[in-house]
Amino acid sequence: MFLFLLLLSASRSGEESPSGDAVPLATGGLNRKSFPEGFLFGTATSAYQVEGETHQDGRGPSIWDAFVKIPGKIANNATAEITVDQYHRYKEDVDLMQNLNIDAYRFSISWSRIFPEGSGKINSNGVAYYNRLIDYLIEKGITPYANLYHYDLPLALEQKYQGLLSKQGRFCGLRRVLFQTFGDRVKNWMTFNEPRVVAALGYDNGIFAPGRCSEAFGNCTDGNSATEPYIVAHHLILAHAAAVQRYRQNYQEKQKGRVGILLDFVWFEPLTSSQADNDAAQRARDFHVGWFIHPIVYGEYPNTLQNIVKERLPKFTEEEVKMVKGSIDFVGINQYTTYFMSDPKISTTPKDLGYQQDWNVTFNFAKNGTPIGPRAHSEWLYNVPWGMYKALMYIEERYGNPTMILSENGMDDPGNITLTQGLNDTTRVKYYRDYLVQLKKAVDDGANLTGYFAWSLLDNFEWLSGYTSRFGIVYVDYKDLKRYPKMSALWFKQLLKRDQK
């Protein structure tokens, strides 16, 4: 009720709600003119979460196709075989974005849809699909942002070479084909989405594919949490840097594009003003976003990791340092939430070593009994807008103010809400408005931000949560896959009107 009254107190936009009634879509004083000229607003998805058609048209299986078949791994044992079927409904989804005044669409390309075996023979049907998607985006005036990898390694590479644990160059074949085939139209490339999540959740606690970890940290049949996350992260950094190097050498001059990487960044705020809690928060930042952006900017891992992980942390050769350092044209920051961090005051060395264990911190979601912010449906996601400002200014100050996009931001509702409940998502409207106010503040204070992407365009398959979590600004009825723009979608439409003064 409070949110509804808050919206009512502001000026009405004249837009129609999904139910047909006039609703207030107050933007908090924000509009396109609030941001620098050329600033892009987009939405984002990933191939595995929205495409469906996992076993047809020549696509090979990914590690997630195998992982979802393990009973109990995914809520309600859901799969992504159909999900929201963007493979067949991409025109409908692009038309939706155009109607909502969206500038750009960030999507990922399924590696196993291009190379069913991870390398070797190319699947022409997969290439044709992405050609159709890219061409239709451009036809409708929407800029494509293509991500080369979003968690979905071809299963064949996992089975033959131990996947990302192997320092093998098969990613080279993928990015070569993608740059050659789509680079005449795609000018914004990302190599990896959230490589930290890939390494940590896939190899430290094993709750993501391929499900590897030490026995002490999860229910895994194989793995080593003390070493494997660091090996995988190292290989991802090298693969990223090699892709950027090759693009710059062979394609950038002609295609006039750019390449970046997408990093998740929870802001970690010290619980108290004590030095111990400040140190804990900084350790968390170093092990989180610093794990990747520090070597990419400075050519080495943060001192925190070097001092704590020691011989378990792989080393870059001199040639690799030259390749890795400076290997971004821009960086995407995925920012959703903020936590308080405190020092656990543990002086003894733990019996079992692992990536998360190495942080040596305590997570806190409240201070003096007061929650850090309202919680969304997901238990990890709290609405803390000021954390976005601090995260962006941290990158600006600590890493030389690189060109940035805010590549993911959003909140979820329960999967079982009704259509009526889902469409009137006033909490999401408030979330986006509050976070964009903080993003504008960061821009005004000097952060070199060039775009913002809402997660997500559509309700979709949400990894471990299956279909029990809805992040979309467009409601999807999973029975017939019909799309219904939510109030948050209409809010963006109002925000992004192009005739505003």
UniProtKB/Swiss-Prot annotation:
Signal peptide range in chain numbering: 1-14
Active site, renumbered: 194, 408
EC main group: hydrolase
A GO BP entry: carbohydrate metabolic process
Molecular function GO labels: beta-glucosidase activity
Cystine crosslinks: 213-220
InterPro entries xrefs: Glyco_hydro_1, Glycoside_hydrolase_SF
Keyword line: Disulfide bond, Glycoprotein, Glycosidase, Hydrolase, Signal
Protein name: Beta-glucosidase 43
Entry EC no(s): 3.2.1.21
Catalytic reaction(s) noted: Hydrolysis of terminal, non-reducing beta-D-glucosyl residues with release of beta-D-glucose
Glycosylated residues (UniProt): 77, 219, 360, 416, 424, 448
